[in-house]
Amino acid sequence: IELAKKLDAEIISADAFQVYKYMNIGTAKVREDETENIKHHMIDVYDVDSNIDVKKYQEDARKILNSLLLKNKNIIICGGTGLYIKALLYDYKFQEETLNNKYDNMSLEELQKLLPKDSLVDKNNKRRVVRFLEKLDNGIKSEKSNKLYDFYMIGLTKDREEIYNKINLRVDEM
């Protein structure tokens, strides 16, 4: 919020749970009294029983992002879900799921043999291996090479104990 004030920026949340109304415990949503008149987007947008996925987030958050850019506003994208951030900022395309995926009945070991030797995919995560192989099949380049916006990415970390202390404090305040 301090940075947003200094930059005259608005904030877009990229957290997969802050987008839901009434999910206040464990999500570290900014409270209205904490915003200091800084506009926050993509918080409390959907009902908890809505079926929201990263594609829907991408569509809705990009509308906000593009609208703010047209107004020449500075923007801070803040939050916890790397996939949501990538989907928002990169040319991240979603394929329609196929009912008869040729990789469905293959074991992880069989799939690993199909990977190029220099691939950086997590070879122990079957879902990621399958997704990588599907991209190879369809000639899809890595999203990271296709930035849609000019941006700086800053990652912040905290000591694990400090994180847990803050979580406990928030729970106690509720």
Name these PLM-found stretches.
Residues 1-174:
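Phosphate/pyrophosphate-binding catalytic cores of soluble transferases and nucleic-acid-acting enzymes
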